[in-house]
């Protein structure tokens, strides 16, 4: 248990930040799931629109340090490639 006032304050801050980061991560996952379902349905325009909405959410999460920026870049790249493959198929 924290003995000093500053340690107790840090614990409070960590709790708030953890909740905030969990909410950001959950929101990002929701947007990615919308892209995944649009890809699975085979609808190219819906998938493209869903990706356009998901991209800023993912980049915002990276900017806030919730997930690494390279992880966001990789995931966006893979989603974009799948949507492009959907257009040619």
Curated annotation (Swiss-Prot):
It comes from the Bacteria. The keyword Translocase does not apply. One of its GO terms (cellular component) is small ribosomal subunit. Keywords: Ribonucleoprotein, Ribosomal protein, RNA-binding, rRNA-binding. GO terms for molecular function: small ribosomal subunit rRNA binding; structural constituent of ribosome. One of its GO terms (biological process) is translation. The keyword Ribonucleoprotein applies. InterPro entries: Ribosomal_bS20, Ribosomal_bS20_sf. Binds directly to 16S ribosomal RNA. Belongs to the bacterial ribosomal protein bS20 family. This is Small ribosomal subunit protein bS20. It comes from Granulibacter bethesdensis (strain ATCC BAA-1260 / CGDNIH1).
């Amino acid at each position: 248990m924290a003995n000093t006032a500053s340690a107790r304050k840090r614990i409070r801050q960590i709790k708030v930040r953890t909740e905030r980061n969990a909410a950001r991560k959950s929101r990002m996952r929701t947007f990615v799931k919308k892209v995944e379902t649009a890809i699975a349905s085979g609808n190219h325009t819906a998938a493209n629109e869903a990706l356009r909405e998901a991209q800023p959410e993912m980049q915002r999460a990276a900017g806030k340090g919730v997930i690494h920026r390279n992880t966001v870049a990789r995931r966006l790249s893979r989603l974009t490639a799948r949507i492009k493959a959907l257009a040619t198929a």
